[in-house]
Amino acid sequence: MATGLKVYGISKKNLKNILLPVPGKKEQRAIAQTLSDVDGLIAALDRAIAKKRNIKTATMQELLTGKKRLPGFGEEWQVKRLGDIANITMGQSPSSQYYNSEEIGLPLIQGNADIKNRRAVIRKSTSEVTKKCYDGDIILSVRAPVGEVAKTNFDACIGRGVSAIFYPNDFLYHYLIFREGRWSKLSKGSTFDSINSTEIKDLEIKLPVDLIEQRVIATILSDMDAEIAALEKRCAKTQAMKQGMMQELLTGKTRLIVPNHP
């Protein structure tokens, strides 16, 4: 149907000759209203997600800086070097000849491509394990884009694009997310944006001395993350439902029952 030599397109005449399944006007209005209602739900969910994210950002600003203290906690916070409070493992890439997609060995986390929605994902495995991270560790990107933070829920081999950080609770995980932008300042000026083990270990962190206070703060923020994730999941399901409805309603596969009144 396309015409032309180098630049292809559909002519006005051919466009007019395309046959489309068209219902009566009442059914058209009913279909349009049904899809508009779903669009309204998606928009409402998007607004709710944005609101929850803004609330979480404000909460992080209050709780992770000590500006707002939780009831029952009054001990002064202290400044510590990251290297003094956490176990840090810098990644080392195995030889590519050991990479595989058959899940032989351990999953391989090499960089940002292996991180999605703050979680490590499995794209490939390696039968040669150089440096290892463990279920629950924090994953920090050390190459551009520098400083992206995630967690892993499985043991893995880590390549040179990331480091693994072990800390006994999720306070540090949330703190590093809160301070993500700091890493880009450290990497400025280098030929290839990256941070090294010394820069990571020397990062100063102000945190509660009381581990219970750390855990309570982490729980509050993790609960907010769970609420946001639930809304995002519901929104994704609604968007998928709309696609299915369009496939059914706009092709005539499924017909709506339209009242006889105008």
Task: Provide a role label for each language-model segment.
Residues 17, 25, 70-92, 206:
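Non-catalytic DNA-recognition/assembly elements of restriction-modification systems
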Residues 37-79, 233-262:
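Short amphipathic coiled-coil heptad-repeat segments
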Residues 83-98, 105-135, 153-154:
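Sequence-specific dsDNA recognition surfaces
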